């Protein structure tokens, strides 16, 4: 079974799972796969939006349920948390939709929104809207980028095994060096 067959068979499920938390890379790759004809563009957008929406909904509910307890654990970031909570109070609609576009806020954003006690009837439709906007934008970028890397992708199957072997050799060399270094540090302790 080649890589293209795997992508065609399991691509949509991988997109849903991959976009549950961060997901920009997965979404871009979904767009590339759509450009290559391995996946259908509308289904890529739908899969990515679904994964992003589910992930953010779970984080929102965790924030709503455990928000105070969770946020107290990040005492050194209290000023940033308070600033974000003020933004949520002033511009809840923009914050809910925009949090998925803010670097570093994709996971903590929905949790903060839940902790702010924004009602679910407001969060859910905004979450759906934001998820579809985010999915459409990043899938489109991936689709456009697919043209740039298309020539390289056609030879990916031929070169994939070489990359896998290279990675395995690097991991093996690093592992052996670490083991020898650790073994060398233990030796003097046994002689003393």
From Swiss-Prot:
<feature type="transmembrane region" description="Helical">
    <location>
        <begin position="122"/>
        <end position="142"/>
    </location>
</feature>
<comment type="similarity">
    <text>Belongs to the DedA family.</text>
</comment>
<dbReference type="InterPro" id="IPR051311">
    <property type="entry name" value="DedA_domain"/>
</dbReference>
<dbReference type="GO" id="GO:0043093">
    <property type="term" value="P:FtsZ-dependent cytokinesis"/>
</dbReference>
<dbReference type="GO" id="GO:0005886">
    <property type="term" value="C:plasma membrane"/>
</dbReference>
<keyword id="KW-0812">Transmembrane</keyword>
<dbReference type="Pfam" id="PF09335">
    <property type="entry name" value="VTT_dom"/>
</dbReference>
<keyword id="KW-1133">Transmembrane helix</keyword>
<feature type="topological domain" description="Cytoplasmic">
    <location>
        <begin position="181"/>
        <end position="192"/>
    </location>
</feature>
<dbReference type="InterPro" id="IPR032816">
    <property type="entry name" value="VTT_dom"/>
</dbReference>
<keyword id="KW-1003">Cell membrane</keyword>
<feature type="transmembrane region" description="Helical">
    <location>
        <begin position="160"/>
        <end position="180"/>
    </location>
</feature>
<feature type="transmembrane region" description="Helical">
    <location>
        <begin position="41"/>
        <end position="61"/>
    </location>
</feature>
<feature type="topological domain" description="Periplasmic">
    <location>
        <begin position="1"/>
        <end position="40"/>
    </location>
</feature>
<feature type="topological domain" description="Periplasmic">
    <location>
        <begin position="143"/>
        <end position="159"/>
    </location>
</feature>
<keyword id="KW-0472">Membrane</keyword>
<protein>
    <recommendedName>
        <fullName>Inner membrane protein YohD</fullName>
    </recommendedName>
</protein>
<feature type="topological domain" description="Cytoplasmic">
    <location>
        <begin position="62"/>
        <end position="121"/>
    </location>
</feature>
<keyword id="KW-0997">Cell inner membrane</keyword>
């Amino acid at each position: 079974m080649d890589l293209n067959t795997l992508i065609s068979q399991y691509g949509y499920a991988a997109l849903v799972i991959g976009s549950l938390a961060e997901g920009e890379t997965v979404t871009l790759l979904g767009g590339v796969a759509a450009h290559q004809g391995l996946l259908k563009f509308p289904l890529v957008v739908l899969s990515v939006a679904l994964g992003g929406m589910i992930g953010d909904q779970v984080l929102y509910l965790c924030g709503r349920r455990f928000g105070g307890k969770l946020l107290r654990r990040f005492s050194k970031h209290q000023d940033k948390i308070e600033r974000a909570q003020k933004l949520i109070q002033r511009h809840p609609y923009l914050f809910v939709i925009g949090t998925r576009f803010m670097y570093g806020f994709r996971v903590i954003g929905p949790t903060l929104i839940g902790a702010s006690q924004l009602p679910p009837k407001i969060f859910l439709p905004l979450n759906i809207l934001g998820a579809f906007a985010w999915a459409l934008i990043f899938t489109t970028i991936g689709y456009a980028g697919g043209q740039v890397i298309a020539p390289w992708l056609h030879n990916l199957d031929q070169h994939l095994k070489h990359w896998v072997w290279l990675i395995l050799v690097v991991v093996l060399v690093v592992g052996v060096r670490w083991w020898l270094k650790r073994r060398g540090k233990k030796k003097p302790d046994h002689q003393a």
